[in-house]
Amino acid sequence: MPLKIRLSRGGAKKRPFYRVVVADSRMPRDGRFIERLGVFDPLKAKDSAERVVLDAEKAKEWIAKGAQPTDRVARLLDGLGVLTREAQSNPKKALPKKKAQERAAASAAAAEKAAAAAAPEA
């Protein structure tokens, strides 16, 4: 039985509220779950203690039993110090594309030429 530690949505429209639950991965998002570990309220301030209320010991037990946290729950557990996530980087996405690099090189060359022409020859 593939277990996941994931978020189950509650609350009203545009007022989300999530329960952190352990559930079979084949069950619906808000469907049957095995155990409730805590709550996550994304509308609270990020530094609020009530934003994430979670039983860390139960979470550790379920992870030891083989339950896999989803990405968002892993981030919440990392914030509480229960789990350590590996740092993710996407360096190629930040690089400018080919045409932008060509434009930057051309503008740098033009600026260099202008600086050389403006500087008095001594």
Curated annotation (Swiss-Prot):
Keyword Ribosomal protein carried by entry: yes
Keyword Protein transport part of the UniProt annotation: no
One Pfam family this sequence matches: Ribosomal_S16
Classification of source organism: Bacteria, Pseudomonadati, Pseudomonadota, Alphaproteobacteria, Hyphomicrobiales
GO biological process, one term: translation
GO CC terms, sorted: cytoplasm; small ribosomal subunit
PROSITE patterns reported in the protein's UniProt record: RIBOSOMAL_S16
Compositional bias (Low complexity): 103-122
Protein name: Small ribosomal subunit protein bS16
Region (Disordered), start-end ranges: 87-122
GO molecular function: structural constituent of ribosome
Family: Belongs to the bacterial ribosomal protein bS16 family.
Residues passing through the membrane, by range: none
Organism per entry: Methylocella silvestris (strain DSM 15510 / CIP 108128 / LMG 27833 / NCIMB 13906 / BL2)
Keyword field: Ribonucleoprotein, Ribosomal protein
